[in-house]
Amino acid sequence: MDEKRLTHLQQLEAESIHIIREVAAEFENPVMLYSIGKDSSVMLHLARKAFYPGTLPFPLLHVDTGWKFREMYEFRDRTAKNYGFELLVHRNLQGEAMGINPFVHGSAKHTDIMKTEGLKQALDKYGFDAAFGGARRDEEKSRAKERIYSFRDRSHRWDPKNQRPELWRNYNGQINKGESIRVFPLSNWTELDVWQYIYLEQIDIVPLYFAKLRPVLEREGTLIMVDDNRIDLKPGEVISQRKVRFRTLGCWPLTGAVKSDAETLPEIIEEMLISTTSERQGRLIDSDQSASMELKKRQGYF
């Protein structure tokens, strides 16, 4: 393949497909983490291309906190049915028994117990030795320094000072028993790359990414969409209809919407071209403590 003849997006696509095939061939029991967001949708599309016309040689895993948007659950189930892939859904039952939720316990504890511990439980339960994730280096500073092959110890912890070199797209996947890796095929993509690829490939995504009137309240400068009756209204808070969309998706009480008129993919791309803020500005879990994301990754977060 002559890379000089490939467009920028074609080069990114080829690199990602190479990584996915490499991991599938090298590891005994890989899995693809499926968070239902735009990056997961792109990664799933790339995986289907990588093994077409065959089926995916690994399952998809959704670590469900019980607090995702209803439209995310509907999209997840519809996608699994349409494509026919194996979907594993894991929930931290101990956390649910403790009544852990983002309103009472805060974003840090909720994320640690329901997402990080839930993920570690699932990886241990099924014995996965490699897990694909849709994280990108342009999202956040700790992810910017993480390798494509991100090695984790027996406790799933990440040590940023103990990473292997990745020269000329050569990846060292040797691990000891009990260790594992997280793999990020979209590492070199940007948010704009993702949206342009979604547009060109006509990839189906959750409707929450498109602007429309939605019930929201403003809390500490963040627009929170009220998705069900579990909302914990504070004195003076008022729910109103505003035209908003989401640049990133997570648990609905911890995910801020942005004011927008972008109702189509071209309009979203145009919005991205003039944006000066990170898509993760709306993720409250990224700012719940100092060096929040790196600390979470050291503890086993994806």
Curated annotation (Swiss-Prot):
Reaction(s) catalysed by this chain's protein: sulfate + ATP + H(+) = adenosine 5'-phosphosulfate + diphosphate
CDD domains linked: Sulfate_adenylyltransferase_2
Keyword ATP-binding: yes
InterPro entries: PAPS_reduct_dom, Rossmann-like_a/b/a_fold, SO4_adenylTrfase_ssu, Sulfate_adenylyltrnsfr_sub2
Keywords assigned by UniProt, alphabetized: ATP-binding, Nucleotide-binding, Nucleotidyltransferase, Transferase
Pfam families noted in UniProt: PAPS_reduct (PF01507)
Keyword Repeat (UniProt): no
EC class: transferase
Any single biological process term in GO: hydrogen sulfide biosynthetic process
Database matches in Gene3D superfamilies: HUPs
SUPFAM superfamilies registered for this protein in UniProt: Adenine nucleotide alpha hydrolases-like
Pathway(s) annotated for this protein in UniProt: Sulfur metabolism; hydrogen sulfide biosynthesis; sulfite from sulfate: step 1/3
EC number(s) reported in the record: 2.7.7.4
Gene Ontology terms for molecular function: ATP binding; sulfate adenylyltransferase (ATP) activity
Coiled coil stretches, renumbered: none
Source species, domain of life: Bacteria
PANTHER family: SULFATE ADENYLYLTRANSFERASE SUBUNIT 2
Summary of the function given for this chain in its UniProt record: With CysN forms the ATP sulfurylase (ATPS) that catalyzes the adenylation of sulfate producing adenosine 5'-phosphosulfate (APS) and diphosphate, the first enzymatic step in sulfur assimilation pathway. APS synthesis involves the formation of a high-energy phosphoric-sulfuric acid anhydride bond driven by GTP hydrolysis by CysN coupled to ATP hydrolysis by CysD.
Complex and partners: Heterodimer composed of CysD, the smaller subunit, and CysN.
Family named by the database record: Belongs to the PAPS reductase family. CysD subfamily.
Protein name: Sulfate adenylyltransferase subunit 2
Species whose genome carries this gene: Photorhabdus laumondii subsp. laumondii (strain DSM 15139 / CIP 105565 / TT01)
Gene name of the record: cysD
